UniProtKB/Swiss-Prot annotation:
UniProt GO molecular function: rRNA binding; structural constituent of ribosome
HAMAP family: Ribosomal_uS15_B
Protein name (database record): Small ribosomal subunit protein uS15
PANTHER family: RIBOSOMAL PROTEIN S15, BACTERIAL AND ORGANELLAR (PTHR23321), SMALL RIBOSOMAL SUBUNIT PROTEIN US15M (PTHR23321:SF26)
InterPro entries assigned to the protein according to its UniProt record, in alphabetical order: Ribosomal_uS15, Ribosomal_uS15_bac-type, uS15_NS1_RNA-bd_sf
Classification via SMART domains: Ribosomal_S15
Function in brief: One of the primary rRNA binding proteins, it binds directly to 16S rRNA where it helps nucleate assembly of the platform of the 30S subunit by binding and bridging several RNA helices of the 16S rRNA.
One GO cellular component, as annotated: cytosolic small ribosomal subunit
Alphabetized UniProt keyword annotations: Ribonucleoprotein, Ribosomal protein, RNA-binding, rRNA-binding
Gene name of the record: rpsO
A GO biological process held by the record: translation
A matching Pfam family: Ribosomal_S15
SUPFAM superfamilies, per the entry: S15/NS1 RNA-binding domain
Amino acid sequence: MALTSEQKKSILSEFGLHETDTGSPEAQIALLTNRINNLTEHLKFHKHDHHSRRGLLLLVGRRRGLLKYLADNNVDRYRDLIARLGLRR
């Protein structure tokens, strides 16, 4: 299910650098993580939805690139973010 504007605002206020931050890596990774979790739940019930599976793989790759960028530029922010999101790394 798509994010509502209220859900997006709450995610951005929690993970962004300021209230309306949408461009920082932390904000982008948090939004991608939410979309990935929603798609993962969808695919548990719709195992043969291969179009959505490909979309999921693209989202995971985009998130991986942003995480790599953050890890290369600021390790402390990277470690804090993966701890807050509960990601394995």
